[in-house]
């Protein structure tokens, strides 16, 4: 089992949700208006010069096949997206248990 955290600018949540739908994933936990800064990207602080924020989705995968499709789709989308700041990020971790 795997746990994935997906992070993107709030502006691009619709395209991220489209990727989930295309991969057959209809389960997630979502946090909106998340503040932060990635390596080599602009801050997303929700105010001032850095007024944007991020969205974070947490998805638990018992079956890793949809995760593989999602990763492929994110890599394709990111390759087509010029600005690194606009890329979708996926962080994958082992998941020991779902209760």
Question: Language-model features: where?
Answer:
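Positively charged, small/polar-rich N-terminal and surface patches that mediate targeting and assembly
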Residues: 1-99
């Amino acid at each position: 089992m795997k746990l994935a955290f997906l992070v993107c600018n709030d502006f691009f949540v619709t395209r991220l949700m489209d990727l989930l739908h295309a991969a057959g994933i209809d389960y997630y936990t979502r946090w909106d208006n998340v503040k932060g800064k990635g390596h080599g990207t602009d801050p997303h602080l929700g105010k001032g010069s850095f007024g944007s924020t991020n969205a974070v989705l947490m998805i638990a995968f018992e079956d890793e096949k949809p995760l593989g499709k999602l990763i492929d789709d994110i890599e394709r989308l990111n390759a087509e997206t010029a600005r690194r700041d606009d890329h979708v990020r996926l962080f994958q971790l082992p998941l020991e248990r779902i209760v």
